[in-house]
Structure formats: structure tokens, C-alpha cells
Amino acid sequence: MREERPIIALDFPSFEEVKSFLSLFPADERLYVKIGMELYYAEGPDIVRYIKSLGHSVFLDLKLHDIPNTVRSTMAVLSRLGIDMTTVQAAGGVEMLRAAREGLGQGPILIAVTQLTSTSEEQMREDQNIQSTLIASVLHYAKRTAQAKLDGVVCSAHEVKVIKAEVPVGFVCLTPGIRPTGADIGDQKRVMTPHQARAIGSDYIVLGRPITRAADPVKAYHQIKAEWNR
């Protein structure tokens, strides 16, 4: 189920910047892009509709975490936008995860966030009062996500093999924190290259700045895509 296209994180604050960026690509190129909280909260559903109108796939990364009824009804609204993938927080619990699935329906891919790739084990213990290892926490959340019949999880590429050994076949792992060889790792703490992520079993990878801030974003995208698929 591996997606051949790297997902481009559209970490822009405005509609105009998104339009300008997407206009760099050939009209017949079908991208897979991520809309995060900043962009969605700034521009609302119209930004999703616009990107879908261009024929691109949309990963709407809102990381919902609320009471089950609220998550269920919100997912029902999001499903009407024609999104291809979205997220919830695994920490919301199995009941909330199941409610999300019910609200979203069976079309879009629904994945749960385990631990953010910016989170270190020390931070997890101090801030979340979770005294296990980081990988144990991630694996626990992944198993609960599978139990709730979601499609997969967001996790570091370093955790993919451990997760896939413990969950049903077909359970997907989306990995942010991907950086081309030699690139600045930014605020990510657990990173891999696209080729390493493929070798370890990642199904989807997400990159932002290595593409969006490149001198030639189209060239950077195709170089990363080639590395991901070799």
C-alpha cells in the first residue's frame, strides 16, 4: 500500500502562497499535499476545495482530540470535503478513535498520531508523565489504534518495524521527520532519509521545508521522489 508520491507539507500561512507554490508544478502533475492546522485555520475549507479542484490528493492533518461525539460529528463534516487522509490523536482513546471512524466513513484514510517526532523520551516522561520507553508508548498507541479499526498511525520511521511486527497486515505507517541526506533536521528529533524510510517499511512520507524552501521546489520534489522510489 506504499504511496509513490512523497507528501508535501504546505506549511504556508495563506491561500496566495499555496497558489504560488502549486503553480510551479506542471498542470498535469498530481501531487499529494498536507494541509496542517495553521493553513486550515487561516483559510478554512476553501483551501481544501481549491486543492482538490486541481486534482491533487489532500492529507488534512488536524489531529483531532475531543470527546467522542464531537470528533464523530467533526469527521462527518470533514468527509464532505473529499479529503484523502486525516488524523486524530491516539491519546484520545479507543472510544474516540472508533467515533472518528464512524464519522469519517470508510473512504478516506484515517490514522492516529502516536508521539510527535519532535518529542524526546525525556520530554514524554516529564510532560506526559509516561514512564515507559518512547517506543513502548508508541507501540501501545499503535495497538490501540489497530483495535479501533483505523488504517494506521503517524510515527517516526525508527518505529515502523516494531509497529508492523505487532499489528495486522495492511496497517499503514506515515512518517514525518524525513530529510534528504545532508539537509537541516529543523525541529525534528527522530529523522531518516527517504531511502531509509522506504527500506524500513514506511508507507507514506511527509516533507515540508526541503521542498517548499528549496531554490527549485519542483526539482527538489522529483529528487526526493526518486530517492523514495529507488
Swiss-Prot record:
Keywords recorded for this protein, A-Z: Decarboxylase, Lyase, Pyrimidine biosynthesis
Pfam families hit by this protein: OMPdecase (PF00215)
InterPro entries attached to this UniProt entry: Aldolase_TIM, OMPdecase, OMPdecase_AS, OMPdecase_bac, OMPdeCOase_dom, RibuloseP-bd_barrel
Domain of life: Bacteria
Family the entry assigns: Belongs to the OMP decarboxylase family. Type 1 subfamily.
Keyword match Amino-acid biosynthesis: no
Active-site annotation: 63
CDD domains named in the record: OMP_decarboxylase_like
Pathway listed: Pyrimidine metabolism; UMP biosynthesis via de novo pathway; UMP from orotate: step 2/2
PANTHER family in the cross-refs: OROTIDINE 5'-PHOSPHATE DECARBOXYLASE
Positions of substrate binding: 11, 34, 61-70, 117, 179, 188, 208-209
MF-aspect GO terms: orotidine-5'-phosphate decarboxylase activity
Description of how the protein assembles with itself and partners: Homodimer.
Role this protein plays: Catalyzes the decarboxylation of orotidine 5'-monophosphate (OMP) to uridine 5'-monophosphate (UMP).
BP GO annotations: 'de novo' pyrimidine nucleobase biosynthetic process; 'de novo' UMP biosynthetic process
The protein's name: Orotidine 5'-phosphate decarboxylase
A cellular-component GO term for this protein: cytosol
Signal peptide: none
Listed EC numbers: 4.1.1.23
Reactions it catalyzes: orotidine 5'-phosphate + H(+) = UMP + CO2
